[in-house]
């Protein structure tokens, strides 16, 4: 924290705290606190640490990839204690954090008018200037939409991987040829960020002059949202 405050955040209106009580009391009421921690038990643990220091009507926002059923439970728990809770799906990664993300909030509806100007100000903007952030609905609906969003994205990634496999192993195309095909697809109906970066990845060479794609392990990790989407589809 101190390295960030004294580094990239230096000269900006950003303060760092190591004590939760001190952090909470530094915020004017009704407080809006956004949690960006790993989904799962870490969210519950942080909430339990925050609860004793909150005032009635304060708002907690979970911006992680939480399971929507966990968000359903957390909304009910927070409201029972007199607080409000927003489960906000956030898409965009590091680039989105710096230049605007897509944000999908849901939960305690009375919180929306208060967090709307904040979330929409940091959201990406469409070509007509519309913020990529609108209220989704009650309880865990925001995280449900993020789950479906990720499920669709992973499906697209699998299609791209299969197209790559066919071109490489059945058609015998090299990386340069495949990059041109993906770049061509990106000029038409298939245009998308994933298609665009696939072409760029296939072109990329490392310091030795070899294609980096040929040195990457053929495996991928996941945070659970794709699996949850498939389970919900089956149910």
Predicted regions: what they are:
Residues 1-32, 36-54, 74-82:
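Conserved N-terminal Rossmann-fold NAD(P) cofactor-binding segment
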Residues 2, 155-158, 220-227:
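Short acidic alpha-helix initiation/capping motifs at coil-to-helix transition points
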Residues 20, 47, 164, 229-230:
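Generic structural marker for isolated residues within well-ordered, non-membrane alpha-helices
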Residues 43-48, 62, 67-179, 187-214:
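Rossmann-fold dinucleotide-binding core
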Residues 58:
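Glycine-centered, small-residue-biased loops immediately flanking beta-strands
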Residues 214-235:
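A conserved active-site cap/scaffold subdomain adjacent to cofactor or substrate pockets
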